[in-house]
């Protein structure tokens, strides 16, 4: 896959979701660069990865290709608590959640960092069987179940491309409720009457 493929895969999930995004497992940044391209010059992206060298490479590439994008790199394990300010408009997990046994726990753990109405975009191999290089992939059907379990809404397939490795790669988008209630309904408060 090249840059145009990365952009095309996530485009429909990213557009209209705001400009402040958190990315889990950014690596050298193939999808981070696609995100910057889609969000435009006012974008703010926080890229998390355990590999300091990959993040340094990402920062250098971002500076050359998308110098107006505000990129913050954080060396951390995204499966643990992330000490950062909440209020992100979107979360991107592109080919990263297949490295953790329980992707639902990871997503559930980062949801407090997202604003009400935010978007979650996942890119993953469309398979429920892994191998040594991709130990815990999950199909789109499995992602739908995970998303529902953690309270995400309107999960939809936004892109899919064939892959020589595990058949296909898909992108899915889900939304966070626009209110504090998990089903998206506003909490009703009664004020005592006399």
Question: PLM features: residue spans?
Answer:
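Conserved alpha-helix/loop element of class I SAM-dependent methyltransferases that forms part
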Residues: 1-19, 34
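Class I SAM-dependent methyltransferase SAM/SAH-binding core
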Residues: 22, 28, 32-80
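A short acidic, Gly/Pro-enriched loop at the edge of an enzyme's catalytic core
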Residues: 79-91
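A short SAM/SAH-binding and catalytic strip from SAM-dependent methyltransferases
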Residues: 89-103
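A short glycine-rich, Lys/Arg-flanked "PGG" loop and its adjoining helix->strand segment in the class I
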Residues: 104-116
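Conserved beta-strand signature within the Rossmann-like core of class I S-adenosyl-L-methionine
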Residues: 117-125
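Short alpha-helix
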Residues: 136-150
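Core SAM-dependent methyltransferase catalytic element
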Residues: 151, 159-194
């Amino acid at each position: 896959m090249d840059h145009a493929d990365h952009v095309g895969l996530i485009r429909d999930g990213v557009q209209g979701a705001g400009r402040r995004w958190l990315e889990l497992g950014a690596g050298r940044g193939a999808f981070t660069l696609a995100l910057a391209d889609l969000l435009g010059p006012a974008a703010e992206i926080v890229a998390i990865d355990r590999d300091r060298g990959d993040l340094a490479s990402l920062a250098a590439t971002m500076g050359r290709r998308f110098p107006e994008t505000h990129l913050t790199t954080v060396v951390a394990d995204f499966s643990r608590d992330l000490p950062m300010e909440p209020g992100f408009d979107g979360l991107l997990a592109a080919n990263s959640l297949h490295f953790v046994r329980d992707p639902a726990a990871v997503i559930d753990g980062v949801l407090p960092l997202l604003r009400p109405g935010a978007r979650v975009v996942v890119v993953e191999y469309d398979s429920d069987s892994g191998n040594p290089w991709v130990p815990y992939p999950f199909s789109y059907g499995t992602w739908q179940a995970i998303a529902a379990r953690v309270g995400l809404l309107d999960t939809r397939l936004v892109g899919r491309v064939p892959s020589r490795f595990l058949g296909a790669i898909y992108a899915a988008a889900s939304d966070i409720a626009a209110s504090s209630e998990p089903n998206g309904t506003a909490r009703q408060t009664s004020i005592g009457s006399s």
